[in-house]
């Protein structure tokens, strides 16, 4: 990542969108290292162990590589280390978080070796530098994008045995003050409201909310399945149109499509890029 950002600087790239959607996370210290590429110095995350001692991951030596505008795109499946990074960027006011509230996994796991293998267990919770927990709460975006993902059945909070966090003291840090995401809110909402794609999202959500009962009539089930397939096809083709690619003629063609190693634009990235352009103009 550091090498890539240096290349972007060399190419005079004016801003980036970091897509962390569906990113389930990774190592705590990798999230810490990634955060340091975007800030001067200071704390990145706090870890509270079973003895209630708090360790602050902190460095006074700057390893910052990227100083230009940053957008972080997240969704309900962004979890753990992804949330550490997104939360730090938000707390430092270093980047704008766009998407949906993240998963809410703020626990730290470790492995203990045994004679027959390893045991994975949870022994700590990590907290944002503000002292607020990510556990259960997740990271709430600055700009919310409508989604078909159901917040009520997704996330750490839906587990019966999920650990209940408490707040801790904040760590000393100095936030960036070079922009206010509220300045982008009105134009962002206007674009979302005018978008055929997101209007379709809202239409599908309303359909689902009004059809909470599942019919046992086979003909009705076939109609529901056909409607779901048509909705999916319409949303998929929207992304292909944005990418300048040929639309799928029918759902069967979409099902038979072999995913290639290529970038496909989608509506959320499209909106994020529009926000990035505005942010660049505000900071220029």
Predicted regions: what is each one?
Residues 45-46, 122-124, 164:
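Residues in well-ordered beta-strands of folded domains
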Residues 19, 36, 118-119, 135, ...:
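Short, functionally important structural connectors and interaction interfaces within domains
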Residues 134-284:
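Conserved functional hotspot residues or short segments at active or partner-binding sites
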Residues 76-88, 111-114, 133-137, 158-170:
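Short flexible/disordered coil segments
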Residues 81, 93, 104-152:
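Polar, glycine-rich mid-to-C-terminal structural blocks
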Residues 1-115, 261, 265, 269, ...:
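Cleft-lining beta-strand/loop regions that shape enzyme active-site pockets
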